[in-house]
């Protein structure tokens, strides 16, 4: 009996010990599990908080890509480009036309020739009629082409996209720009009184091809000019935005536009002199072509004559670049905000 009772007590103690031990083990496991879960939760939350902006950015980029592939997006870009380009071109031409007239008269004058300072707005009305569609057409080609090339080319070749888009825009818009330029410069040099008379008499004397006099020299000047000016402008804006870590304001856009215009104006002055001489000569055919024009100018007037009118040209394009790109970016911003509001509504 004593042995049995002793064995029962021993068994009970052992059972209690086992249950106690098991209970402690279970509580340790649970406690350990809770500790691990509590430790893991901040990490998971931290990962989620880091991951959410990335997901949002990816989703945003994907939405933009889908939106850019939408034909409606292309039409909107085209529409906005036509408006911004046309408006900017007209504003610059109207504001700085007298400086352009002075530049043209200086370039045409031979040694000892007198510069006429009257009628500095001669031909402005007819010129604006051509500048509006020409500028609109340029940007209608430039902006969509630029956006398409930037999507295809790597980031380190963005300058190539700007160069190519500028050259292509210049080539397409030259269809309208050249006749406009021919009429403008002949009126600036006093050959005609009004734009309609100029068009009628040029076609009567020289045929329809007279409206495209100096077309080759125009492309020789304007394709490099358009490509360089817009490449310099776009690249400077990219660099400035990266350095400032914000969008540019209106004065900064105007300042960069002025610099890009002035630099490009200096580099392309000889090409502008050649183009002007060929366009204003009319049916007299003093120069037989680009190469003959260069040789004749150097032989008769010296190589310095190729830089005639550089001062007014740089002033005109520098100030013009400031106004042009300032108006351009502001108009783009206004149209973009209106489009965003209508989309959200």
UniProtKB/Swiss-Prot annotation:
Its tissue distribution reads: Expressed at low levels in seedlings, leaves, flowers, stems and roots.
Q: Which domain of life is it from?
A: Eukaryota
What coarse category fits the chief subcellular location reported for this protein? Answer: plastid
The record's section on InterPro entries has:
Mit_carrier, Mitochondrial_sb/sol_carrier, Mt_carrier_dom_sf
Residue intervals passing through the bilayer: 82-102, 121-141, 156-176, 254-274, 309-329
Q: Which UniProt keywords apply?
A: Chloroplast, Membrane, Plastid, Repeat, S-adenosyl-L-methionine, Transit peptide, Transmembrane, Transmembrane helix, Transport
Q: How does it sit in the membrane?
A: Multi-pass membrane protein
Instruction: Indicate yes or no for the key word Transferase.
Output: no
What Gene Ontology cellular-component terms does the record carry?
A: chloroplast membrane
Per UniProt, the transit peptide runs over 1-31
Q: Where are the Solcar repeats?
A: 76-148, 157-239, 252-334
Q: Name one GO biological process term.
A: transmembrane transport
| Annotated compartments | Plastid, Chloroplast membrane
Chloroplast as a keyword?
Answer: yes
Per the similarity annotation, which family is this?
A: Belongs to the mitochondrial carrier (TC 2.A.29) family.
What is the role of the protein in this entry?
A: Probable S-adenosylmethionine (SAM) transporter able to catalyze both uniport and exchange reactions through membranes.
Listed name of the protein: Probable S-adenosylmethionine carrier 2, chloroplastic
Which organism does this record belong to? Arabidopsis thaliana
User: Quick one: which gene encodes this?
Assistant: SAMC2
């Amino acid at each position: 009996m004593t042995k049995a009772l002793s064995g029962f007590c021993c068994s009970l103690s052992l059972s209690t010990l086992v249950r106690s031990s098991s209970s402690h083990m279970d509580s340790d496991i649970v406690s350990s599990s809770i500790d691990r879960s509590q430790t893991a939760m901040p990490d998971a939350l931290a990962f989620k908080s880091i991951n959410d902006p990335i997901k949002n950015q990816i989703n945003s980029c994907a939405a933009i890509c889908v939106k850019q592939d939408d034909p409606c997006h292309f039409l909107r870009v085209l529409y906005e480009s036509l408006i911004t380009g046309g408006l900017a071109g007209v504003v610059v031409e109207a504001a700085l036309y007298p400086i352009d007239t002075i530049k043209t008269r200086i370039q045409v004058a031979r040694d000892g020739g007198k510069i006429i300072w009257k009628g500095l707005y001669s031909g402005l009305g007819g010129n604006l009629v051509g500048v509006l569609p020409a500028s609109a057409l340029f940007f209608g080609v430039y902006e969509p082409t630029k956006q398409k090339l930037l999507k295809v080319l790597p980031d380190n070749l963005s300058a190539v996209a700007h160069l190519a888009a500028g050259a292509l825009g210049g080539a397409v818009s030259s269809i309208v720009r050249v006749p406009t330029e021919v009429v403008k410069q002949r009126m600036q040099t006093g050959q005609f009184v009004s734009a309609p008379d100029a068009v009628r008499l040029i076609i009567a004397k020289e045929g329809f091809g007279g409206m495209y006099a100096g077309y080759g020299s125009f492309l020789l000047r304007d394709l490099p000019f358009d490509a360089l000016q817009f490449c310099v402008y776009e690249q400077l804006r990219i660099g400035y935005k990266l350095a400032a870590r914000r969008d540019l304001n209106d004065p900064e856009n105007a300042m960069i536009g002025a610099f890009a215009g002035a630099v490009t104006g200096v580099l392309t002055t000889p090409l502008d002199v050649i183009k002007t001489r060929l366009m204003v000569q009319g049916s007299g055919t003093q120069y037989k072509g680009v190469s003959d024009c260069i040789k004749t100018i150097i032989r008769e007037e010296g190589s310095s004559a190729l830089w005639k009118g550089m001062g007014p040209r740089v002033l005109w394009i520098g100030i013009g670049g400031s106004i042009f790109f300032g108006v351009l970016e502001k108009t783009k911003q206004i149209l973009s905000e209106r489009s965003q509001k209508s989309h959200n509504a």
